[in-house]
Amino acid sequence: MKEVNLLSSAAVLRALYDNKKDIYDVIAEFIRASIKQKSIRVFDSMECTELLLSEFGFRIPEAIVKSCLKNRLKKNGEIDLIDGRYCVSSKFSLNEQAEKDFSTSRNNYEKIITELTAYCESRIIVPIDRSRLKSDFEAYLLNPEKAKEYTSIIANFILVNEETPEFRSKINQIEEGLILYTGIRYSPNLSTLGHWSSELTIFIDTEHLFN
């Protein structure tokens, strides 16, 4: 069974959001991918919610999953609702760009982990627990203040590489994807996700204004 990693999934989330801008369309792509990966033909919303967790590490409220199934996949004719269960139709398909984003994200993540492992091995005498290192890396990006076994060396690794544009871009995509994911889990209104709807007042010092 393939390893599930929230960070690579978060990076895909950010990439798809850039392309689509509608968060329900983005979640729908993850639903399509999970259905395709497990080759399931019949399911309900709860099973689909569990698929998103097992395949991508996403804990998404079932109500949101239901909305995506009804207003995206069913509306497009990709699935049919029969006796309370969804059945995959012949129109079901995963967007080619989405597939490319999934593949690119996983490759980018594995490259970062490989570089991180090599960095740790060059500075730590004892053998590296790769599984723990991955877990601590995820924990660090989710909450840098929470100390783990490899927190210090992970912070050093990021500091050493942060001036490299490609590396910084990959880390930014993961971090921004995690922010979107948090919004999906806890926002009462997904339609406002990524938008600033309230009045914003900006104060600029005259020294900067006329420079």
At which residue positions do the language-model features occur?
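Noncatalytic, typically N-terminal accessory segments of nucleic acid-processing enzymes
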Residues: 2-211
